[in-house]
From Swiss-Prot:
Membrane topology label: Peripheral membrane protein
Organism: Buchnera aphidicola subsp. Schizaphis graminum (strain Sg)
Family: Belongs to the ATPase delta chain family.
InterPro entries: ATP_synth_OSCP/delta_N_sf, ATPase_OSCP/dsu
Entry-linked Pfam families: OSCP
Protein's job: F(1)F(0) ATP synthase produces ATP from ADP in the presence of a proton or sodium gradient. F-type ATPases consist of two structural domains, F(1) containing the extramembraneous catalytic core and F(0) containing the membrane proton channel, linked together by a central stalk and a peripheral stalk. During catalysis, ATP synthesis in the catalytic domain of F(1) is coupled via a rotary mechanism of the central stalk subunits to proton translocation.
A molecular-function term among this protein's GO annotations: proton-transporting ATP synthase activity, rotational mechanism
Any single GO CC term annotated in Swiss-Prot or TrEMBL for this entry: plasma membrane
Protein name: ATP synthase subunit delta
NCBIfam families according to UniProt: ATP_synt_delta, PRK05758.2-2
Compartmental location: Cell membrane
Binding partners and assembly: F-type ATPases have 2 components, F(1) - the catalytic core - and F(0) - the membrane proton channel. F(1) has five subunits: alpha(3), beta(3), gamma(1), delta(1), epsilon(1). F(0) has three main subunits: a(1), b(2) and c(10-14). The alpha and beta chains form an alternating ring which encloses part of the gamma chain. F(1) is attached to F(0) by a central stalk formed by the gamma and epsilon chains, while a peripheral stalk is formed by the delta and b chains.
Keywords: ATP synthesis, Cell membrane, CF(1), Hydrogen ion transport, Ion transport, Membrane, Transport
Length: 177
């Protein structure tokens, strides 16, 4: 993995999380490809490598892009100009496309609750887990009254235990220590 990929990853991840949140992955993909094409054009490439101020550079770039980019993309361009990151934009695009590819697959999560969850609670849990795992979530939903209250989330070998039973066990272990 190159240093440029390491620098690009947080940008790509932030963009991808925004795209998931706004349900606009395809729109962002097209926008990033469009921005990349502008950056890669010979005339613009020379212009971007000059010693212009970040505000002038971002204003110029936004002018060139015109109505093809929205407010969020304009903010991204301002951020890239401010941090002098236009040179790694191709890496940002590649990282975004990797995240999109992994997102297309479903992550299977076992969700165990003490009682039946309401639909909006399941949707909220799914949204949070999609942000954490950066993939679509498919639930295997079970009810287990023995956990008393709360939920347990299992993904392969990883377990997030937010059950009352688990808290009571931890408390018991501390008191018996």
């Amino acid at each position: 993995m190159s240093v440029l990929d390491t620098i690009a990853r947080p940008y790509a991840k932030a963009i991808f999380e925004l795209a998931i949140e706004n349900q606009s992955i395809e729109k962002w993909k097209k926008t990033l490809i469009f921005i990349n094409e502008i950056i890669r054009s010979k005339k613009i490439e020379k212009f971007l490598s000059g010693s212009l101020s970040p505000s002038y550079l971002s204003s110029f770039f936004i002018f060139v892009a015109g109505d093809h980019i929205d407010k969020d993309a304009r903010n991204l361009i301002k951020l890239l100009a401010e941090n002098q990151r236009f040179k790694i934009f191709n890496n940002i695009l590649r990282q975004f496309l990797k995240l999109e590819t992994s997102y297309q697959g479903n992550t299977i999560i076992e969700l165990i609750s003490a009682y039946s969850l309401q639909e909006h609670e399941i949707i909220d849990i799914r949204c949070i887990l999609q942000k954490i795992f950066l993939s679509k979530i498919k639930f295997i939903y079970k009810i287990d009254h023995q956990i008393l209250d709360g939920i347990i989330i299992k993904k392969a070998d990883t377990v997030f235990d937010f059950s009352v039973r688990s808290y009571l066990k931890q408390l018991s272990d501390v008191l018996n220590f």
